[in-house]
Each structure stands twice: as C-alpha cells, then as structure tokens.
Amino acid sequence: MQSKRLGIVSLLACSLAVLFGISDALTADAQSPTFTVGWSAYAGWNPYFYMQKSGILKKWADKYGVSIKVQRFDYAASLDSFVAKNIDACAMTNMEALDMPAAAGVDSTAIIVGDYSNGNDAVLVRDNLTFQTLPGKPIMLVQKTVSEYLLERGMVLNGQQSQLGKLHLINTSDADIVAAFLNNKSNQAVVTWKPLVSQIVADKSVHSIFDSSKIPGEIMDLMVVRTEVLNTPNGQKFAKALTAAWYETIQQVATGQANALKYSAAASGDSIESYKEQLKTTALFVSPKSAVDFTDGSDVQKKMDLVRQFCFTHGLLGQGIHSVDDVAIAYPNGAVQGNKARVRLRFNSAYMQAAEQGKL
C-alpha cells in the first residue's frame, strides 16, 4: 500500500513538473522576440519545411532566446510580404532580391547563400529549334523572372545578342505553363524550372537546348533578411539561430537522411525520387565553408553585374532609376557595385563564417 501511495505521489509530482514545465515554456515563448521566415516550394528551399517539422529550428531558436515562425507562400506572395515588412526574412533568388526589395527601397541582406541552379532552369523546344531559329517563334515563360534572364543569356552565349529584340515572349504563369505547352503542339518553345521541366521533357518530342548549368552561379538561391532587423541585437540572434539550423538541416538532406528527404519532398508535393532528381541539378553549398568561399569570391561580383544589368535594361530596378548604379550592391570584402550612398542589397558572409568556425 505504501509503495502504491508513493507511486501516486511521484506521479502527481511528475505531472505538476510537466505542467509547470509547459507553463514555463509557454511563458518563455510569449516573452521571446518573434521572427517570421517566408519560403516557397523549390528544391533548395523545401528543407525549411523539414527544419521546422523536425524541431531543428526550435532547438536553435531556444538556444538564442528567440521564437522563429516558418511560413509557406507562393513565390510572388512571399516577395510582396517581405517588401511590405510583414515578414522578417525570405527565401529568394539573387535576381528577385535585387528587383523586388532592393528596387522598392527595402535595404536587405543575404545571410545564407544556399545553392545555385545547376540545370534546374531550362530552355525547352520542339521541332529541332535552335537559338538561331528561335527569334519570331512564340516562347512561353514567366516574364521578368530568371526564366527570361536564362533565355537571354542563352541567346548571347550562342551569338544571337543582336536578335534579342525579335524574341516573341508569351507571359504564362507557372501554374499553367506545363498544360498550356503540352496540350498545344504548335507551341514550340518554353522556359521554366524543375519540377516543371521534368514534366515537360517527359514528352519525347521536347528537348533542352540550354540550361542553368551553362551559367553556373548566376541564378543563386538566398535567405534574405531586412537589414533593419539584422541591425538589432535580437535580429542578430535570429540570424545566428536560422543559419545554424540551416546547416544542420541541409547536411541531413545532402546525406540522404530518410525524414529529411521525406519532408523536403512532401513540401512541394513531390515523390522522394523526383526530389532527388531535382537535387542533382541544384548545386547545394552543404558546408558553410563552401558557401563562404563562393560568397567571398570575386566571381560573385561578376555574376551579379550581369544580373543587375539585365534588371536595369528591363526596367526592374524601380521607378525613377536612371542608372544601374542607383540600386547598389555591397559585398563582404567592402566592395560596392554602384552608388555607395544607395546600397540596397548586401551580401554578408559573417553568419556562414561563424557556422564554419563552429561559433554558433
């Protein structure tokens, strides 16, 4: 009887401890500064879903005394939310970082360079079209995006720069582009990204004439934080927690950890096999050192110059912009492309470097 009573008392004590523990945790969460990260479905960004699902993000957020919410958006909506300052950080390409927040005057900082497209984006054709015969033919794509950038780079690298003005572009949403292209055999060319590319080339009459592996490092996938957030002590804790969580997560994805692949694939409604196929054409910077070496290298500036020139030529840097230098970019070595008084996009490798040095 005595042992049973002690058991009941012990159980009650444990229950109270659990309840008080939960209460303390809830109180701590309520008191913690909260930050929100936006992401959209893409091979290099799907791991943010797993990061949250697995508890990896919470573990690092707790270490730094912050609370981090991860919110999924359609890509365009995520950028709009970031520009409107409704979220603190957002996954986006280098081009969108320049022509959305930076062009809107929102000073932004890339703290994680996660990967670059190494074949995920492609120019696909029927009827044996080439870059020489492409001008004048209807080309389906999402205009003013990396798809149009890829198409123009393909034209230039194949000696067709003088024909750029003759391209006949059909603006088509990514939600409609696969069906619109495949269901009408008179459509001869399309530019898009995986997994849409994989769905289209399943039709054996379609093949790729150019993809992003031909322009390595030019289409980068970033985690961008508003600089005003990063300039606060809590914002820096947030950046440290997010960076640490990212590298723990991406190493699990890269090494094929079962749940990491399962949830990363599920994030975009893909099978694990389809997701693995997308990863093959995504140049992931799995180690922080590889990301730091890339970000700190002079090659990044050359690639970003191509992107900013494209954005300026197409009027993507905002109203009243009369020079490509009016929306400037700063780099980790202190170099600035453009007017130093008008820096709107910054590459900051400090957090990746801290991860490399084991200081997070």
Residue ranges and their predicted role:
Residues 1-12:
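Bacterial N-terminal signal peptides that target proteins for export
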Residues 10-21:
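Bacterial N-terminal signal peptides
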Residues 22-29:
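Signal peptide processing junction and immediate N-terminal pro/mature segment
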Residues 29-171, 180, 188-194, 217, ...:
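Short, glycine-/small- and polar/acidic-enriched structural segments
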Residues 49, 98, 152, 198, ...:
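Predominant activation on well-ordered alpha-helical scaffold segments within soluble catalytic domains
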Residues 96, 163-170, 175-272:
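Pocket-lining segment of extracytoplasmic ligand-binding domains
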Residues 231-320:
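Secondary-structure end/capping motifs
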Residues 308-360:
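Conserved C-terminal helix/tail region of periplasmic/extracytoplasmic solute-binding proteins
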